[in-house]
Amino acid sequence: MGKITFFEDRSFQGRCYECSSDCPNLQTYFSRCNSVRVDSGCWMLYERPNYQGHQYFLRRGEYPDYQQWMGFSDSIRSCCLIPQHSGTYRMRIYEKDDFRGQMSEITDDCLSLQDRFHFSEIHSLNVMEGCWVLYEMPSYRGRQYLLRPGEYRRYLDWGAANAKVGSFRRVMDFY
């Protein structure tokens, strides 16, 4: 079970809302979100209702302003608790759509796709075990995309506008 608290103002001030499960529409509870406290679990926050728009991965900790979670604004309109995973993590990445081209099997985090694999685009992937977060830029920066187990035949399937990937990591409650 997870627990997250949203605050309208920075530094955990103003009206707050505590949440312990997925919520497709947070607009009824607060109008803006400038700070967050994650007491337990890993969460994905979304800038729009129904799990749409920019995504932000948060794990246990305190985030006194939205820039701490790489937010573009104070708009958080939905959230989901990411299921805990205790086994191994496995994902296959491909250089072309529909699982074609060069394939690499991944079992751990990658700070820089370019440095490790000498390419910077992933066109399709298959998450076999665990949940992962892809980042648009190296060092876990830029736009973020939650990947649950399943097949993603093209980058549009995980919500990206292009195939650019800079880094990725396993969703874990600790690092």
Curated annotation (Swiss-Prot):
A Pfam family: Crystall
A single GO molecular function term of this UniProt record: structural constituent of eye lens
Gene3D superfamilies (alphabetical): Crystallins
Record-level GO cellular component terms: cytoplasm; nucleus
Record flagged with keyword Repeat: yes
Superkingdom of origin: Eukaryota
InterPro entries: Beta/Gamma-Crystallin, Beta/gamma_crystallin, G_crystallin-like
Assigned keywords, A-Z: Eye lens protein, Repeat
Keyword Repeat among record annotations: yes
Domain Beta/gamma crystallin 'Greek key' residues, every copy: 2-40, 41-83, 89-129, 130-172
GO BP of this protein: eye development; lens development in camera-type eye; lens fiber cell development; lens fiber cell morphogenesis
Region (Connecting peptide): 84-88
Family: Belongs to the beta/gamma-crystallin family.
Function, in words: Crystallins are the dominant structural components of the vertebrate eye lens.
Comment field on protein domains: Has a two-domain beta-structure, folded into four very similar Greek key motifs.
Misc remark: There are six different gamma crystallins identified in mouse lens.
Protein name (database record): Gamma-crystallin B
Organism encoding this protein: Mus musculus
